[in-house]
């Protein structure tokens, strides 16, 4: 069977085929019905595949070759920070004292693990300029919701129930308005100015006595630093609102600037992005939230504290928003982030930002002659191009992304942010070499030339992948999400 015709594991099944055998029974045989109630016993056997161990190994090895990850190739997905994840992280996370413990163990038996969590929170407080951090949230959007729920609790504790609106820029991550809605707020959008930054006059018009918070990413999703951030903080604070920092782009300012020093009251981080937890496959992640002093009472409980040299959880938090996750966060990702921070140190984290920004600006300048550059200025860790020039030739940004697959690259983020037509958002990260950047630049230049000379080649891409272009409308309206077993 060719790689193109890869069968489902169910289709490899043959009745009676097994992958292992059990030793002969040396204890009395007991019927399952004698142990379990009929409520828990199937009327019919589950339709599970019957395959050999070799079948399984070849099947999943073949599938793995269809995947693209940071370890297999360049992954310039904008606003996702697809950097290399050092393998020392995996080694430390697999230490039995970390990997083989359970959250229900007695605290005295896991003091080392609790110390790691406590120290990690202190490192994150220092990095962000916050006064206290919770590690409970499972990922970025979960962190957003947690931070917004704390802001809501803060206003309600003051009897300020009219603060029902959260302001977001038109360049915001899509999770920002979504998180605000789930947290019970209405969203108000403010526009960007000609420089790609928040329009201060529009912000002033939007802020009022109903404003609960302004959610902001800095640098923003255009890769541009909000230079007037202190003035923006003053506008929001004078109106009685809070300033929320979406930490998706923290990789651009590590050891260079701290959200707390810019005037932010709440910060969420993406440890799986900035601090090298493996991501891109759906989880797990880690989205810690840091707050300034006046929001500490509302942190999720329990709060990890150190008392008389011993680490313990404090449940006596009457104003806390409650738990936001069972137990204490995604521990394995936190171990990896802690390992990364300790191995890099302050100087190493500073170098991360410097190289991430350098790589992004290098690529931007190299590609600017071939694609439209909406904001022709110094960028931070990522930048956006526009495919408007190619669109006039009949080649869409989607076509460009599909054509990149033929060169072995994961495409950049496309059509986001929404305020840039035919947007192409590229984030190279700090871990890529100049040779890798140059090869990707050459591919992008070749595609731009193909759009002029042979647009059909780009329009019909990809040409070398196993799966070509799907019917995306049909996939969205009539998804096939599971295998339907045939009648036996």
From Swiss-Prot:
Pfam families: GcvP2_C (PF21478), GDC-P (PF02347). Belongs to the GcvP family. C-terminal subunit subfamily. The glycine cleavage system is composed of four proteins: P, T, L and H. In this organism, the P 'protein' is a heterodimer of two subunits. One of its GO terms (biological process) is glycine decarboxylation via glycine cleavage system. Gene3D superfamilies: 6.20.440.10, Aspartate Aminotransferase, domain 1, Type I PLP-dependent aspartate aminotransferase-like (Major domain). It comes from the Bacteria. Signal peptide: none annotated. GO terms for molecular function: glycine binding; glycine dehydrogenase (decarboxylating) activity; pyridoxal phosphate binding. InterPro entries: GcvPB, GDC-P_C, GDC-P_N, GDC_P, PyrdxlP-dep_Trfase, PyrdxlP-dep_Trfase_major, PyrdxlP-dep_Trfase_small. This is Probable glycine dehydrogenase (decarboxylating) subunit 2. It comes from Bacillus subtilis (strain 168). The glycine cleavage system catalyzes the degradation of glycine. The P protein binds the alpha-amino group of glycine through its pyridoxal phosphate cofactor; CO(2) is released and the remaining methylamine moiety is then transferred to the lipoamide cofactor of the H protein.
């Amino acid at each position: 069977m060719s790689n193109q015709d890869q069968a489902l594991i169910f289709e490899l099944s043959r009745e009676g085929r097994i992958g292992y055998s059990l030793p002969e029974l040396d204890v009395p045989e007991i019927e399952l019905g004698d142990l379990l109630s009929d409520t828990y016993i199937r009327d019919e056997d589950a339709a599970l595949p019957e395959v050999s161990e070799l079948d399984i190994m070849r099947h999943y090895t073949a599938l793995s070759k269809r995947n693209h990850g940071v370890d297999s190739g360049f992954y310039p997905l904008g606003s996702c920070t697809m950097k290399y994840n050092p393998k020392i992280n995996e080694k430390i996370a697999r230490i039995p004292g970390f990997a083989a413990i359970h959250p229900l163990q007695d605290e005295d038996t896991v003091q080392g693990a609790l110390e790691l969590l406590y120290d990690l929170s202190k490192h994150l407080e220092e990095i962000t300029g916050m006064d206290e951090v919770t590690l409970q949230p499972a990922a970025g959007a979960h962190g957003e919701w947690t931070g917004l729920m704390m802001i809501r609790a803060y206003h309600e504790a003051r009897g300020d129930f009219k603060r029902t609106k959260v302001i977001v820029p038109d360049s915001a991550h899509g999770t920002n308005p979504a998180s605000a809605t789930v947290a019970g707020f209405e969203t108000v959008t403010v526009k960007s100015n000609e420089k790609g930054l928040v329009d201060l006059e529009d912000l002033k018009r939007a802020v009022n006595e109903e404003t609960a918070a302004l959610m902001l990413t800095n640098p923003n999703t255009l890769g541009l630093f909000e230079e007037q951030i202190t003035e923006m903080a003053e506008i929001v604070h004078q109106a009685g609102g809070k300033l929320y920092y979406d930490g998706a782009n923290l990789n651009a300012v590590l050891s260079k600037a701290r959200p707390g020093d810019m005037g932010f009251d709440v910060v969420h981080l993406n440890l799986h992005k900035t601090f090298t937890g493996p991501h891109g496959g759906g989880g797990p992640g880690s989205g810690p939230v840091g707050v300034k002093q006046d929001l500490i009472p509302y942190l999720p409980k329990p709060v990890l504290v150190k008392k008389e040299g011993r680490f313990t959880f404090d449940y006596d938090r009457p104003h806390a928003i409650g738990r936001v996750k069972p137990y204490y966060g995604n521990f394995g990702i936190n171990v990896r982030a802690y390992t990364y921070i300790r191995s890099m140190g302050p100087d190493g984290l500073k170098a991360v930002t410097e190289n991430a920004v350098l790589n992004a600006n290098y690529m931007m300048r190299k590609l600017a002659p071939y694609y439209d550059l909406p904001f022709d200025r110094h960028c931070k860790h990522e930048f956006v191009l526009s495919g408007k020039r190619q669109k006039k030739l009949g080649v869409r940004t989607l076509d460009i992304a599909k054509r990149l697959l033929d060169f072995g690259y994961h495409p950049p983020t496309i059509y986001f942010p929404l305020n840039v037509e035919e947007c192409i958002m590229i984030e190279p990260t700090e871990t890529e070499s100049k040779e890798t950047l140059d090869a990707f630049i050459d591919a992008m230049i070749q595609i731009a030339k193909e759009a002029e000379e042979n647009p059909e080649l780009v329009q019909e891409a990809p040409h070398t992948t196993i799966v070509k272009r799907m019917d995306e409308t049909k996939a969205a309206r009539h998804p096939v999400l599971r295998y339907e077993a045939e009648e036996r």
